[in-house]
Amino acid sequence: MKQIQVDLGVRSYPIVIGRNLMSCGEHFARFLQDKKILIVTNETVAPLYLEKLELQLSSFDCVEPVILPDGEQYKTLAQMDSIFTSLLQQNSGRDTVLIALGGGVIGDMTGFAAASYQRGIDFIQIPTTLLAQVDSSVGGKTAVNHPLGKNMIGAFYQPKLVVIDTDCLSTLPAKEFSAGMAEVIKYGIIWDSEFFSWLENNVERLKTLDDEALAYAIGRCCEIKADVVAEDETEQGVRALLNLGHTFGHAIEAEMGYGVWLHGEAVAAGTVLAASTASRMGLIDGSIVCRITKLFEAFDLPVSPPDSMNFEQFIKHMRRDKKVLKGQVRLVLPEAMGQAGVYSEVSDELLEDVIRCA
């Protein structure tokens, strides 16, 4: 078992990583004493893990869980109402703890509900997808989508604990695992060139769910994320680098319809577009673009946008991106392997050329 601390002063919290952690109630005990507990999960995860978790929490005051539909298209204010209704029906106060049992959608919605209910109650993340384990469960970004933009309604609100049970990956569909690898690869591109090289050399070990390889990859991603969040919790500086590929990627998700492309798939294609943009600007040479592209392909991820999307469709959504400043689209672009920066002086003409040639 590995433990990583997210250092945020009085809001610091541990990330616990290991096998069979959902069967070890002691990890939760100190966070749940004298609390009312509401588990939020979805229709896919509930049959797999809800009973196991409830068994470990049987000595605590657990109320009827909220089971939501599964999918990015359900990450809405309307679906969040189910969480609020349950809390109110149970006369839940600020002594309530929400537990997010699921992937990124469940984690984001549960966190936002926790931030909003009675102006803030505690919550715990138990991420069950690779993408959530290495990215969305750590750092306190909580949100729901709007038809006009992804994650536009939300808050920064930190969990009290993140429990990453790597055994959950054994039930994860291959397509979802690949989507999570897009975020894993991102960390190597923006932060750690040695980690990127390690990923290149361990593709098969990761794809076959080798325990040691998974533990190392997840742990390294969480270490990087914890350091970045500790330095820049609310994304005023270095944390923006974690959005590599996301400006293009969110445009793909919004245009195609949430859930048509998995988030990680859109991030992979978006990251290749960002790398191609950086190459056109002379920030990196073509060999880095090739390495990035080949590694995404090795994990069966898309490396180009949908054929049906044109520049006008991209730019419409990119101009609604949260990083837009004074009307200018700001892109995270690689500057070397393991290094990236934020750029606002990227012409529409260059972007159109990159998208057209993708």
UniProtKB/Swiss-Prot annotation:
This is 3-dehydroquinate synthase. It is an enzyme of class 4 (lyase). The lineage of its organism: Bacteria, Pseudomonadati, Pseudomonadota, Gammaproteobacteria, Alteromonadales. It is found in: Cytoplasm. Transmembrane segments: none annotated. NAD(+) binds at residues 70-75, 104-108, 128-129, 141, 150, 168-171. Binds 1 divalent metal cation per subunit. Can use either Co(2+) or Zn(2+). Catalyzes the conversion of 3-deoxy-D-arabino-heptulosonate 7-phosphate (DAHP) to dehydroquinate (DHQ). The gene is aroB. Its EC number is 4.2.3.4. Belongs to the sugar phosphate cyclases superfamily. Dehydroquinate synthase family. It comes from Shewanella woodyi (strain ATCC 51908 / MS32). GO terms for molecular function: 3-dehydroquinate synthase activity; metal ion binding; nucleotide binding. One of its GO terms (cellular component) is cytoplasm.
